Amino acid sequence: MMSPDLDLNFSSNCNLYDHRPVARVLIPLVYSIICPVGLLGNALALHVVISSTTKINSITLYSANLAVSDILFCLSLPLRAVYYGLGFHWPMGEVLCKAIALLFYLNCYAGVNFMTCLAVDRFVALVFPARLAKLRKAKNVRFVCLAIWLLVLAQTLPLLTIGLTKTEPDSSITCMEYPNFEGVFKGLPYMLIVAVVLGFGIPVMTIIACYSILTHKLHQAAKSNQLTERSGKTKKARGVIAGVVFVFVVCFSPYHIDILQYMIRKLLYETDCKELQSFQISLHITVCLMNLNSCLDPFVYFFACKGYKQKVMRMMKWQVGTHFSSVKNSAESSGTGDVLGTRRNNRIIMNNVGEDQQICYQPSAT
């Protein structure tokens, strides 16, 4: 293994940004899609979760915190898109780089933890509904949510103590790039391996285990009750579970596996410039994939939550109704009755948006 000084000099003499012409177009393009979709989708999800329930429970608390973490995460993307659009150049200073890094990593791993909590909560609701009922009480869940935010904040605050920007040989200033960390932490490979295990390995195993048991239990329930199977509820629940697991694994696995394999190689032998270049490119690709999770979560809400789906459809109907109302109003000056009828329909739709809806499918009554 290289010494920190040699490792730093090695990365400085190795051109890690040959893919700049492609990255400065594709990455901002991806972020320009993820950011608005993620912000709008999660804002709507948060609105549905908060406004469409008469009683706060564990599911609504975890879902609301997940939506908040996704929204805050999306807020870090515009400046990151500017950075990539400028060809890996950060002209906004060290302080703002640290602030964006903190916002990025804090909400990324807060989201992972809240997704894990949702999996455990649904598992407890089905397998141990009476024995572990205290864990699902709103008062206790609030403490769990607060503990998650504080824990992830404590893990990411050290980022503020180190320099995250670096002036490259071509005078460009990079921000939050892997080579900027080399030489700062002596045991960087060990630290990142532990971080991957704690921040991704344990959560993904927990999520897969909980949802696998849930799927098995739902399958058993469907076999013993044909009426339940014919209703399609268990089939829908299994589909939702598969979607949640699929989105989590596809979005988060490549990034963490990429880091893990490279850190293991660094511990086994001295990696060369070509390997570091490949790792740098793969990091930029897998980070984009990980960011995609923040705008896919609302689609999981859409299919899993009745209230979310109905509110989206009603808002779309209201927009269509308003459009046709405007067209008729301008084209038919004498068509007063039709216009009034359209307005009445719009008012009905707007009133229905405020109705209480079932937030999320839960596998058993609690």
Curated annotation (Swiss-Prot):
Keywords: Adaptive immunity, Cell membrane, Disulfide bond, G-protein coupled receptor, Glycoprotein, Immunity, Membrane, Receptor, Transducer, Transmembrane, Transmembrane helix. Residues 1-24, 89-98, 162-187, 261-280 are extracellular. One of its GO terms (molecular function) is oxysterol binding. Residues 51-70, 121-142, 211-236, 306-366 are cytoplasmic. Disulfide bonds join C97-C175. Glycans are attached at N9. GO terms for biological process: adaptive immune response. Gene3D superfamilies: Rhodopsin 7-helix transmembrane proteins. SUPFAM superfamilies: Family A G protein-coupled receptor-like. One of its GO terms (cellular component) is plasma membrane. PROSITE patterns: G_PROTEIN_RECEP_F1_1, G_PROTEIN_RECEP_F1_2. InterPro entries: GP183-like (IPR047160), GPCR_Rhodpsn (IPR000276), GPCR_Rhodpsn_7TM (IPR017452). Pfam families: 7tm_1. It is a multi-pass membrane protein. It is found in: Cell membrane. It comes from the Eukaryota. The chain crosses the membrane at residues 25-50, 71-88, 99-120, 143-161, 188-210, 237-260, 281-305. Belongs to the G-protein coupled receptor 1 family. Probable receptor for oxysterols that plays a central role during humoral immunity. Promotes activated B-cell localization in the outer follicle and interfollicular regions. This is G-protein coupled receptor 183-B. It comes from Danio rerio (Zebrafish). The lineage of its organism: Eukaryota, Metazoa, Chordata, Craniata, Vertebrata. The gene is gpr183b.
